[in-house]
Amino acid sequence: MRVLGIETSCDETAAAIVERDDMGEGRILSNLVLSQIAEHEPYGGVVPEIAARAHVEALDRLVDRALNDAGLKLYEVDAVAATAGPGLIGGLIVGLMTAKALAMAAQKPFYAVNHLEGHALTARLTDGLPFPYLLLLVSGGHTQMVLVRGIGDYERLGTTIDDALGEAFDKTAKLLGLPYPGGPAVERMALQGDQKRFALPRPLKGEARLNFSFSGLKTAVRQTATELVPLTDQDVTDICASFQAAVADTLSDRVGRSLERFKTEFPDCATPSLVVAGGVAANKTLRAALENLCTRHGFAFIAPPLNLCTDNAAMIAWAGAERAATQAPDSLDIAPRSRWPLDEKSAPVFGTGRRGAKA
């Protein structure tokens, strides 16, 4: 089965063609992503209206290129899949309506994909990973630990109770006068800094619950920087290094408890695995900390290639293909959802929930 996938949930316009054979193995035939960093950089973050307009301008051409790169015509794909949520509603509408129109024109089945499910299933495309496994999703809009039991069968073990980790990186970078996007900028500066100079907090470390919290850490960074004004270059690098070390310690503690939970629930699992996805997964320091953690706990550490960790359409096409193998297509009446948890039957997280551009 060959599926055309479309992703427009935030600030990347993406189109891809993925093939899934009868044995469940996948192959990427094309995968194109057009970033909007240049459009949003002057504002220090994603502007929803600008993002939606950029999707409108780019998507049709990108779909044509994806088909051409795969050597296919639209009528030769077997299904069309698009992100229907969660994300920025304007961008979701652009991608969803385009995908519906293509599916209708080509008389192909349509699948509305949860963006988070795309991340959750990527390791099955890249590594052929069997169920069950753990997923750590760390991005600008989400920080979640998810137990992946099967297609459509997910349990959220922990999530952020305030800020997503990617947002904490971006806000720290903006506070220190570093360029957008903030994650890579903080990582570069941290390489030159002293991570022991500032004693920043490790939120929720040692607690039994599996949730995350980064608001207090972000506030501590602001207070530290304010006390040092005017900041020297060394101050900035040391703050970045101390911040990154605090994040690594926090993740190791939170994820370590989730690994123990997994082993308790699946004691006979022959290949326990931790999958890490999302833009923050590109951070080498955090990856190294998580790899060491997995080694100590006897888990395989799996991080898809960087271009498949960040937002892309190959994961959406693959999620559509996985669902098509066992489920009926979705109605063309389905609406986009700015909020769409993977585990809809679970109790809501305490508080008002995530807010902001990538919530």
Swiss-Prot record:
Gene that produces this protein: tsaD
Domain of life: Bacteria
Main location group: cytoplasm
Organism of provenance: Brucella suis (strain ATCC 23445 / NCTC 10510)
SUPFAM superfamilies named among the record's database cross-references: Actin-like ATPase domain
Binding site for substrate: L137, V138, S139, G140, G141, D170, G183, N283
Alphabetical UniProt keywords: Acyltransferase, Cytoplasm, Iron, Metal-binding, Transferase, tRNA processing
A single BP term in Gene Ontology: tRNA threonylcarbamoyladenosine modification
GO molecular function, one term: N(6)-L-threonylcarbamoyladenine synthase activity
Protein name per Swiss-Prot or TrEMBL: tRNA N6-adenosine threonylcarbamoyltransferase
